[in-house]
Amino acid sequence: MMAVTNECSRRDVLKATAASLVVAGYLCKGSSGWGYAQSAFHRLTAQDAREGEPQEGAIEFASSDVKLVEGFRWAKSQALAYARTDGTIGPWYEASLPGRDAFCMRDVSHMSTGAQFLGLGPRTKNMMHRFAANISAAKKWCTWWEITRDNLPAPVDYNNDHDFWYDLPANFDVLDACYRQWLWTRDSDYLDQVFLNYYRHTVTDYVQAWDHDHDGLLEHLPNFGHMGIATYDEDLQDEILVGSDLIAAQYAAYRGYTAIERARNELKAAAEFEQKADHLKSLYNGKWWDAARNCYFGAIGEDGKFHADLKEGDGRCAVELPLYYGLTAAGPKTHAGLDILEQRLQSDLNSPRGVIGGVEGRSYMPDIFYMYGRSRAGYSALTAMMDPGLQRREYPEVSYTVIGNLGTGLMGIRPLPFEQTIETFPQLTEETGWAALHHVPVGRNVISVKHVKNNETSLTNENGPGLAWRAAFPGKFRALFSRGKEIPATRALRSTGTAETCSIVHVERGETRVVRVASG
C-alpha cells in the first residue's frame, strides 16, 4: 500500500488501491477480482477532469535511423496540413480523397490513432460525434458515410435517406475506434448520450436491419446496389454477400461495446455482447477456414458459397482486417494469414505497377505486422509507406497511419484498459539502434519514450498525475532492472502470441524511469 501524504485525498487512496488491483489482475488474468477491480477503478476515475487539451503538433521523433526520422518529418507535416477549421463543422481534418473537403467513416476510424499522437484527438471526437448524431431509423440505422466541412452528407455519396452509398463494416469500425479513442483520451464525452445511443443502435437495431436471414451476420443482397455493401472492397459490391472484413469489424464492435458497458457497470449487457463476440470468433475460425488451402476464406459470395479471394492481387477482405481486428485464432491459422500477408507485401514492393489494391489496403499492413510481433515485416511496410516514390502518398490515411504505426508499432506505446496505465513494447530492428518519441498525449498525461534496441526503455512523465507503466520487452529474459536493482518481472505470451517479459513501474509527474533487461 502506498504511503498517504497530506495532499492525498481519500479518493486518491481508493483510486490507487483499485489501480493496484487492476494491474495485478492484468498480470494474473485468472484473478477472480479482475472484473470487480476494473469496474471499481473506472467508476472512481470517470469524473476526473482532463488536465487541458493536448497541444497540436507537439510530438517529436528522434532516432539513429535516418530513414525513420525523414519519414516522420514528412508524415507530421503532411498530416497537419490536412487539419482544418474552415466550414461550419468546427475543428476537423481531411479523411477522404484530397479535395473532397470531407471525412469518411473508414478513414477517420483508421486515422484516429495517428491523429491522437499528433494532438488532434479533440478533432477526432468532433468528427466521430457527427457520425454518431446522424444515425437514424430512416436510414436503416446507418449514419452519413462521408460528411463535409459544412456538416452535410457528401453529395457524391448521398441523394436522400433511401438512396446513399454505404459500406456495412463502417458502423462497427466507428464504434471500435470510439472505444479506442476513449482509452487514449479518457474523455468522458465518448460516454455521453449521443455516443451511447450510437453504440447501442449499432449492436442491436443496425444488426437486425441488415441481417436478412437472422444468422447474426449482415448481408448485401443483389438488389441493394451501393447501399449496404458487405465489404470495404467496393469493387466487389455486387459479388459479396458477407465479407470477412465485415464479420471482423462486427467482432471488434462487440468487443468494444462489451468493454464500454463493463466500464459503465452494465454487467448484464457486457456479458451478452462478450458472448456474441466469442460466437463470431468461433464461427469465423470454424466455418471460414479453408483447410485444403491452409487459409481463411475471404467472403461468402452472392452465390452463397465461400470464396478465398474474389479479386486477384488484392484480397484485402480476405485476411488483412480479420488480423487487424484480432478475429483470427492464435497459433497456426494466424501464422498462415500473416505469411500470406507478407507474401503480398513483397509482391507489392516488387511490382512495377506499384501498390496493388491501393494505398488504403497497404496502410493496414504495418499495424498488423507490429501487432503480431513481426517487426521485420512491420519495418518494411512502414518505411514503404514513407517512401517519396509511393503512388498516392498524399492520400491523408498514409501520413496519419505512418505516425500511428511509429507510435503503437515500432515504439509499442498504448494505453491499457484501466486509467493511468501505459504500456511500452519496443520492436526495433537492426536498422534502428535507438528511437525516441517525445510529447505523446495519453489520457491526462504527456509522456516521452526512448528505446535502446529492444533491451532498454526509458519513460518520462512530462505532465500529468503519476502513472503505472507496464514496461514490456519482446522475448523471455532472466530478469529486469531499474535504478540498479532487479525488479519483479513476469514472463508470458502476449494475446497475439509473442513472448514477453514485463514489469509494472510507477512514474510520478516530472520523473524519468529506466527499465532494462538482464544481460547474459
Question: PLM ranges: what are they?
Answer:
Residues 1-9, 16-23, 34-36:
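N-terminal secretory signal peptides
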Residues 19, 39-103, 126, 283, ...:
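Low-complexity, Ser/Thr/Pro/Gly-enriched N-terminal "stalk/linker" regions
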Residues 55-74, 131-144, 181-244, 272-279, ...:
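Active-site acid/base region of carbohydrate-active enzymes
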Residues 56, 373-520:
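Non-catalytic C-terminal accessory modules of carbohydrate-active enzymes
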Residues 74-85, 121, 130-137, 174, ...:
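Glycine-rich, acidic and aromatic/proline-enriched surface loops and short helix-turn segments
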Residues 82-98, 136-159, 208-236, 285-307, ...:
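Glycine- and aromatic-rich loop/turn segments at beta-sheet edges
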Residues 90, 95-101, 146-173, 188, ...:
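The feature captures the catalytic groove of carbohydrate-active enzymes
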Residues 101-137, 193-204, 244-263, 275, ...:
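Active-site core of glycosidic bond-cleaving carbohydrate-active enzymes
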